[in-house]
Amino acid sequence: MKEIYVADLGKFENQAVVSFFAVSSRQLRSRKDGGQYMALTLGDRTGQIESRMWDNFADAATEFEQGDVVKVRGEVCRYNGRLQLNLEKLRIATADEFELADYVPHTSKDVEELWSALVKSVDSFSDLSLQALVRSFLDDPVFAAAFREAPAATRLHHAWLGGLLEHVVSLVGICELAAQHYPEINRDLLLTGAILHDIGKLEELRWGTSFDYTLQGQLVGHITMGIGMIEKKLATLPGFPPELRMLVEHMVLSHHGKLEFGSPKLPMIPEAVLLNYLDDIDAKMHTMRSEFERHQAQGGEAGEMTDWVRSMDRPLLNTATFLKPKSPPEE
């Protein structure tokens, strides 16, 4: 059974380890000498690590696929400032060698408490049409089960089971504060956008021991898929105001903020502008939190910058640990 997790690997730098990991991705790449090597991303519920198998991988590569759990032996090293696992041996794990829960990252928050908070927010709506629309989703048992479980992304922010619900509840909270600060904002419209903006991810993503995109997700994308889901629910709500329908759909269509970021329309109403920026803020704050946790797990010093964070195009500094009083040296 599993004893060493990704979060533990920093303790074993320049040492050999044997453990089990789930395969998040794999591909054969060319070496400078004309040969090939196998590049893998391995992971468990505590994180992921880039891995390389330079030799003797031909037979092993035919035994497993993305999403499988494998047993590996390799050396923990550091490449470009990040921990990496150089593999010597690899084989697929048998069913009795692992517990699935060890390999699937999941929210640290109570899912039922998150769900109750979301329902409570919807119950407080004064606009009964918007309330009926959102309830048509939350009262759908298939939707509710998927929404409780889905990740918000494959690798970036909230990339764990329950991550989408955690993100939405967090976003609803800061949207509530924004609506209080800007009284001209339509609070119920803003919260409706916050709750529904990413529902297309329930069909865009697939999740298990690894997170990936469905074929429809790759070809269509969660924004368009989310609009389709909203249209289906609106068809069951006769008398729904057409002007509200237009505004709700605009919120979803524009929530990425820019055409080059995947939104077919720019935000053109105050609620859509707020949703775009607050969604981005929540995602970035959680990305930073995850990077600080990874930095610490890999043995990084509290007062130093992290490695380059690709999704934010910069390194980061954790001010909470940077400003923490230093313990006096032991005599």
Language-model features: where?
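Short, acidic/hydrophobic/Gly-rich beta-strand patch recurrent on exposed beta strands
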Residues: 39-44, 207
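Structural detector for short beta-strands of small beta-barrel domains
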Residues: 14-32
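Acidic, carboxylate-rich catalytic segments that either coordinate divalent cations
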Residues: 271-331
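Extended, charge-rich, solvent-exposed interface segments
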Residues: 84-149, 225
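OB-fold nucleic-acid-binding modules
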Residues: 1-20
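OB-fold single-stranded nucleic acid-binding module
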Residues: 26-36, 47-102
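Divalent metal-dependent catalytic cores for phosphoryl transfer on phosphate-bearing substrates
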Residues: 155-156, 166, 176-298
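A short mid-domain helix/strand-loop element embedded in enzyme catalytic domains
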Residues: 131-175, 196-200
